[in-house]
A protein has these predicted regions:
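RNA/tRNA-interacting regions in translation and RNA-turnover enzymes
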Residues: 1-179
Length: 179
């Protein structure tokens, strides 16, 4: 992930985002060649590895995708405008922001989620709904001013029956289940 040169006028800029691999990069370079079943698990596994050479080798496939400006405090729409400017000028990737409607319905959200899953470069499991206002970001946990809309129809969840659970004590005396 290359360095980001912040343009003049963005003093003390703080951006929040997440590390992702595009569907294309995962399919082309890692699907079936790794123990990770999907792009999200692949990135989590890569970041969690203790092997720095493995991280270095595969980091070129990982993108930092921004989705919020924490400082300065801006309305949601202005945050995305700022991120879009940085994306165009600095090749910083950002999530897509669009006004859907002032009257949201399940049908409208399902349609938007389906279209987003199809056209987005990254694996998407939901969309975030929020009002275009200034908000204080929480120190921990999810923000109270926004919520994630997901639909079971669009997820890769499977139902399974657990036949047995083996409980083992860890070195710190915690019980850990093994299915």
């Amino acid at each position: 992930i290359g360095s980001l040169h912040i343009p003049v006028g963005y003093k003390d800029l703080i951006i929040r985002g997440e590390l992702l691999i595009s569907k294309e990069n995962y399919e082309k370079n890692f699907k079936g060649k790794t123990s990770f079943s999907n792009p999200r698990n692949f990135v989590t596994g890569l970041i969690g590895t203790k092997n720095p050479n493995e991280i270095k080798k595969q980091l070129k496939y990982i993108d930092f995708v921004s989705y919020a400006v924490l400082n300065p405090v801006l309305k949601q729409g202005l945050q995305f405008k700022t991120l879009r400017e940085l994306e165009l000028n600095q090749k910083l990737k950002c999530v897509h922001f669009e006004y859907i409607s002032s009257h949201l319905t399940t049908e409208l959200l399902d349609t938007h989620l389906s279209q987003t899953k199809t056209k987005d470069s990254y694996e998407v499991d939901g969309i975030i709904i929020c009002h275009n206002e200034n908000y204080t970001n929480p120190v921990s946990g999810n923000p109270k001013y926004a919520f994630a809309y997901k639909n079971e129809q669009f997820t890769n969840k499977k139902q399974a029956i657990v036949l047995s659970v083996e409980w083992n004590a860890s070195k710190d005396k915690y019980l850990k289940p093994k299915i």
